[in-house]
Amino acid sequence: MVVPYNEELLNPASLDVTLGSTILVEVEHTPELQILDIGHYTQADPFWVTPGEFFLAETVEMFFMPANVGAQFVLKSSRAREGWDHAEAGWCDPSWTGSRLTMELKNGRRYHSLAIWPGMKIGQMKFVLVDQLPEVGYDKKGNYNGDSGVTASRGHL
């Protein structure tokens, strides 16, 4: 269901997820978000996100949700207490498969930048069993199935 699976990320009722090495950022005079590789940053030498800055990020983990399991992404409480905001659009439908989660993140601090780096624990997934299988799964009708990396909005589809 989650690849790579790391038992050290398992909590009593959730699974921690980690930040991948690619983000999409806003740049002046360009309406589309631009790809930024943060793969060379580390915890000791992080990428700094300025106050109020919004970006999309991917998880390292790839998800292969069965037809009877959904999941919800939430920030780790430590990250929220540091000042991170999440747009709460992290619902993963049953049958969402072969995809990395794209997270909508923002530095909610007023005066101080916040650090990110690949591999940092950013959030956790809460998994939910569904009672009935859907007639048509997300693998057949979803806009974001099979996304192997961070993905901008496909809301126009």
Located regions from the model:
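DUTPase catalytic domain/fold
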Residues: 1-157
